[in-house]
Design a protein with these regions (language model features):
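Active-site acidic/histidine proton-transfer and metal-coordination neighborhood
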Residues: 61-161, 171
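Acidic-and-aromatic substrate-binding clefts and catalytic sites of carbohydrate-active enzymes
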Residues: 1, 20-32, 98-100, 136-142, ...
Length: 172
C-alpha cells in the first residue's frame, strides 16, 4: 500500500519504525516519504532490496559486470533514501547465487569486490549494509551465523554487518 494509508495504521498499532521493501528508490517521492514518517512519528530502520533480484535479476555477484554495476547503483539509491535515518540496506537475495557468477570462487570474489564498494558508499551516506544470512534453499553462501561472522572478520568493512532473519535461521 501507499505511505498515507499504511503509516497511520502502523502508528495507531504502536509501531515506531518501519522497514520498507523497495525495488527502486528512484520511483518513490523521498520528500513525501519523509513527511509521512514524521507525521506519523515513525522512522525508517531499513530497506529490503530482494525485489530488484526477483524482478530484474540485479545482484552483486553476477558474472556480468554490467549487472553488478546496476545492482550497486540500485543499492546506492536505497542508501540515499535511508541516509536521513542512518538506516540499514539489507542485501539478501541481491547477493545472487553461484549460478549467477558462474562458479563459487567467482561468486565470492564478486561479492567481496562489490561489498568493498558498497561499504565505502555506506560510509559516505551514513548508512549501514546488512548482509543477510539466508537459508540454503534461497542462498548458496553463508547460512550460519558463525560463518557470517568469520566472513566479516576476514574483511575490514566499517559499515557492513550481518543481518539475521529468524525465518532463515530456523531452516538452517
Amino acid at each position: 500500500g501507499n505511505f498515507e494509508t499504511i503509516f497511520p495504521m502502523m502508528r495507531e498499532d504502536g509501531f515506531g519504525a518501519v522497514e520498507l521493501h523497495l525495488w527502486d528508490s528512484r520511483e518513490i517521492d523521498r520528500k513525501k516519504l519523509d513527511n509521512e514518517l514524521k507525521k506519523n512519528s515513525l522512522t525508517l530502520t531499513s530497506i529490503g532490496t530482494g525485489g530488484a533480484y526477483g524482478t530484474w535479476h540485479l545482484n552483486i555477484a553476477d558474472h556480468d559486470k554490467d549487472i553488478r554495476k546496476k545492482a550497486i547503483e540500485c543499492l546506492k539509491e536505497h542508501m540515499i533514501t535511508a541516509s536521513p535515518y542512518e538506516g540499514v540496506i539489507i542485501i539478501g537475495s541481491m547477493q545472487g547465487r553461484f549460478k549467477d557468477a558462474g562458479s563459487p570462487e567467482e561468486f565470492v570474489n564478486n561479492v567481496e569486490e562489490s561489498l568493498d564498494i558498497l561499504d565505502r558508499m555506506a560510509q559516505e551516506y551514513g548508512v549501514y549494509i546488512g548482509y543477510e544470512l539466508m537459508n540454503h534453499y534461497e542462498s548458496d553462501f553463508l547460512f550460519r551465523i558463525e560463518d557470517g561472522i568469520r566472513f566479516l572478520n576476514e574483511h575490514s568493512y566499517k559499515r557492513t554487518g550481518i543481518h539475521i532473519d529468524t525465518v532463515h535461521m530456523n531452516v538452517d
